[in-house]
A protein has these predicted regions:
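Metal-dependent amide/peptide-bond hydrolase catalytic core
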Residues: 1-2, 8, 181-191, 195-427, ...
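Acidic/His- and Gly-rich active-site-bordering loop/insert found
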Residues: 2-113, 132-141, 312
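Sec-exported extracytoplasmic/periplasmic mature domains
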Residues: 18-25, 48, 52, 130, ...
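Solvent-exposed loop/turn segments at secondary-structure junctions
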Residues: 27-28, 88-89, 150-153, 182-185, ...
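Structural motif
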Residues: 78-80, 174-176, 393-394
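Short beta-strand segments
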Residues: 83-85, 147, 177-179, 208-210
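Short pre-catalytic strand/loop immediately N-terminal to key active-site residues, enriched for Gly-Thr
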Residues: 106-117, 370-373, 414-415
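Acidic/histidine-rich catalytic neighborhood of metal-dependent amide-processing enzymes
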Residues: 110, 116-194
Length: 437
């Protein structure tokens, strides 16, 4: 009996993704990171073996991005950027059932930090290029292949750095594909794929409360921790109103049609919930979210600190960020300082055009009859940086998933994993798209 975990039994996509997971490229944020250098050298070596000439760009020591260009048969066509990132968010090993950086193969899945975010797509990019070379073919247009650093901290040292300092790398490109789209969901017994055509605005803020330092036994009304706790509770409990963007309106209309319900009688949240596990993303795309994520205060049990801080991850619908920040100031009150640490734009592009048609056609070739639907991502990607060069970005990392697989829960979650069969599917779909578009 063949061992399904043996190297010769694994698709090359799984082997490469496993190798990449074994590079601990943890990005802790606020400038703290293990760096991407080892992973960057790995992908650069692979690209070199394919006869390409990858360039490595180091924005700060250890923070390395890799870019290569694949020449197409018709260079008059606009180039397509195909990009991934090699950094990952932290993982707490004690919470996992496997070592998050071992790249364990079990239960028909590849486990590890980055298995879906997004070393799976990094691997699919490399094996798709392998397949194109083995076939002795060229893509129809130039491809700009990018492996960015620092996406998990907003891309300041990765995609934004390259857009600022080396925009010529993306010369001639008008469109891009990357993560968090192209994955399947199940609706009314049928499969559909969500193509990401928009992203929410990103605002990361720090709340700072100040008070009076004192002995822990004192009666203290001017307590920084109490002030911060009240502010954090107000922010976290705020239920922001639903507003439908063009993308979300189109998605909900298609969901109502597939589910055979009257959209006038079924609300947006109900339609989102009907998408199953994808509702984690879709419900969040209906409204702004403000989630406190980190609290910092104090240094000893019996000392009242004079400062307390909280980090809040704000994702607004495109165009709402200024109004949300103004309301945030009202929510926390005048005693709380709001420091904006990072801010990036929201995106929304049309669900139409030759690339969307090519994606839909390629998916239908590999999964006949499946619907392809647009959606607004509740998070963000490096497409934000590329948009500054006029490049329209889409989320398309194709994966055909089991109905019960909670894909959104894998992002930044415990026991992150991806089905091996989905990687094989993604490789085939991506290869065909890159060859024929």
């Amino acid at each position: 009996m063949v061992d399904p975990t043996a190297d010769d039994a694994l698709d090359a996509t799984a082997r490469i993704a496993r190798d990449l997971i074994r590079f601990d490229t943890t990005n802790y944020g606020e400038g703290k990171s293990n760096g991407e250098a080892d992973a960057a050298e790995y992908v650069a070596a692979h690209l070199t073996r394919l006869g390409l000439e990858p360039e490595m760009f180091e924005s700060e020591p250890g923070r390395v991005s890799v870019i290569a260009r694949v020449e197409g048969t018709d260079r008059s066509k606009p180039a397509l950027v195909v990009h991934g990132h090699t950094d990952v968010v932290p993982a707490q090993p004690d919470n996992w059932s496997v070592d998050p950086f071992e790249g364990v193969i079990k239960d028909g899945m590849l486990w590890g930090r980055g298995a879906v975010d997004m070393k799976n797509m990094d691997a699919m990019m490399l094996t798709a290029l392998d397949d194109i070379q083995v076939a002795g073919k060229q893509p129809a247009r130039d491809l700009v292949i990018a492996f960015f650093a620092d996406e998990e901290a907003g891309g300041v040292l990765g995609s934004h750095y390259l857009v600022d300092t080396h925009p010529e790398l993306f010369a001639g490109a008008t469109e891009a594909i990357s993560e968090v789209g192209g994955y399947s969901i199940h609706l009314n017994g049928a499969r559909a794929y969500l193509l990401q055509t928009g992203e929410k605005t990103l605002v990361w803020v720090k709340l700072i409360a100040r008070g009076t330092a004192a002995h822990g036994s004192h009666l203290m009304r001017d307590n920084a921790v109490t002030k911060l706790a009240e502010a954090v509770a107000a922010v976290g409990r705020r239920d922001w109103p639903i507003r439908l963007t063009d993308t979300t309106s189109q998605l909900l209309g298609e969901l109502a049609r597939i589910l055979e319900v009257d959209p006038q009688k079924v609300g947006p949240d109900e339609l989102a919930i009907a998408t199953g596990t994808a509702s984690r993303f879709i419900q969040a795309s209906l409204r702004t979210t403000t989630n406190p994520t980190v609290l910092t205060a104090g240094y000893k049990h019996n000392v009242i600190p004079d400062t307390a801080e909280a980090l809040v991850d704000i994702r607004t619908l495109p165009g709402e960020e200024d109004a949300v920040l103004a309301e945030l100031a009202e929510l926390v009150g005048p005693d709380i300082e709001i420091l904006v640490l990072h801010r990036d734009i929201g995106l929304e592009t049309e669900f139409a055009g030759p690339l969307v048609e090519a994606i839909t056609g390629t998916l239908n070739t590999h999964d006949p009859g499946a619907a392809v639907l647009p959606y607004l991502l509740s998070g963000g990607t490096d497409n934000k940086a590329l948009s500054r060069l006029g490049i329209k970005g889409y989320g398309f990392a194709p994966l055909k998933l089991p109905p019960e697989f909670d894909f959104p829960a894998m992002f930044h979650g415990v026991d992150e994993r991806v089905p091996l069969d989905a990687l094989v599917f993604g490789r085939r779909v991506l290869t065909d798209l890159l060859l024929n578009y």
